[in-house]
Amino acid sequence: MRKVKPKLNLTSQTARIVNLSHDGRGIARINGKATFIQGALPGEVVEFQYTRVKKDFDEGKLLSIVEPSTLRVEPKCPHYQMCGGCSLQHMSAEEQIRFKQSHLLDLLSRYGHTAPQTVLSPLTSHPWNYRNKARLSTRFVEKKQSTMVGFRERNNPRFITEINQCPILNSKIDTDIVHLRKLIDTMEDKQCIAQIEVAAGDNEVALIFRNLTPLTEQDESKIRKFAQQFQYKVFLQPGGLDSVFCFYPSDAHAYLSYELPDYQITFQFHPNDFTQVNAELNRKMVKQAIQLMELKNSDIVLDLFCGLGNFSLPMAKHCSRVIGVEGNRNMVERAYMNAKSNHITNVDFYAANLDDVMEVRNLVNTSFSKVLIDPPRSGALEIVKQIDSIDPERIVYVSCNPITLARDTDILVNQKGYVLITAGVMDMFPHTAHVESIALFQKG
């Protein structure tokens, strides 16, 4: 018998918000079921309309605030209500931090079945113009005879929010979005550019144009003039990631750079490389991680998911030796390049399958007193399941997903004999629900 799909009640409803979901949506309890409403805050009475009805939960669209929360602030961005670039601008900066810290501790309790002995003070940065990496979608609209440049719409990712500014993006891009749109509007093939990747170093900003078809000579000339006038490095990507090349200046080397001034280290990176989005917060994060490691001159440290050496190189200045292991061979080459340019010789880097700890052990074949783990959103499940083969006395875990951190914490604490000494959030992405965190584990 075919299930009957519940009908949407399209009349406006009123509800009181009792909590926030992990992604920052307000939660109302109606007839024993959770209803998620984007843009609503705890304590508020809101008017909303159902947009989705499921067996276990419903979703609604916020229509108006009947009783506002004292935590509510006016969003800075004029595109905020539609744009999917961020989701918490309606919440005060202080409350955003409290929400993220509470979310982390709740997940550690619920899925990690533990709590840290102490909670770290949150790491924060300037909340605006912090985002040094982004992907902007573009689309030429025939009916309007104009180009849309922006992030995907929050409630309908098939569509692009046309933006004239973005207060979370690097300040140069924030200012120049309108000029980017004008550039594409003047091109002969206005459908050619599908997206624009933004990557900023400390002193330069690069744009990667994903061109679906070869550029005409006239369009190449227009892009060069744009890059020259507004001072950008421009890369083209005619195919896959391996096809990216520096288009302007033609004689420029392909790298951007950022500095960790506390350690007198400068990193060079390709615009396609993974680097932290928020430079100010990254500097604070590296410093905190090294403090938590409590490095001694005799320590040999293993840095897993080491990337281009963001933690490895500064740690190497405080210990005997650092071994960095990374799954991406290109990043291993970049890490060696950065070690050489910074005259750091007590580091080695290897490419390995980080789901196979025995491969890592056989590759490096040494003992480690301390380990730093900085995995992707999927976490470090295989690493923590096989941590006995490394047996470090201290682990610092840097996480970009509190759910997988909580899962891995459960294994480390309840199966492997480690103690969760401390943990806390690092607000790498202000005005979004994204939670970056750091945790210290000590062998019990």
From Swiss-Prot:
The keyword Repressor does not apply. S-adenosyl-L-methionine binds at Q276, F305, N310, E326, N353, D374. It catalyses: uridine(1939) in 23S rRNA + S-adenosyl-L-methionine = 5-methyluridine(1939) in 23S rRNA + S-adenosyl-L-homocysteine + H(+). It comes from the Bacteria. CDD domains: AdoMet_MTases (cd02440). Pfam families: TRAM (PF01938), tRNA_U5-meth_tr (PF05958). One of its GO terms (molecular function) is RNA binding. The active site is at C400 (nucleophile). GO terms for biological process: rRNA base methylation. The keyword S-adenosyl-L-methionine applies. Residues 5-64 form the TRAM domain. Its EC number is 2.1.1.190. Keywords: 4Fe-4S, Iron, Iron-sulfur, Metal-binding, Methyltransferase, rRNA processing, S-adenosyl-L-methionine, Transferase. [4Fe-4S] cluster binds at C77, C83, C86, C166. InterPro entries: 23S_rRNA_MeTrfase_RlmD (IPR001566), MeTrfase_TrmA_AS (IPR030390), MeTrfase_TrmA_CS (IPR030391), NA-bd_OB-fold (IPR012340), SAM-dependent_MTases_sf (IPR029063), TRAM_dom (IPR002792), U5_MeTrfase_fam (IPR010280). Belongs to the class I-like SAM-binding methyltransferase superfamily. RNA M5U methyltransferase family. RlmD subfamily. Catalyzes the formation of 5-methyl-uridine at position 1939 (m5U1939) in 23S rRNA. This is 23S rRNA (uracil(1939)-C(5))-methyltransferase RlmD. It comes from Legionella pneumophila (strain Lens). The gene is rlmD.
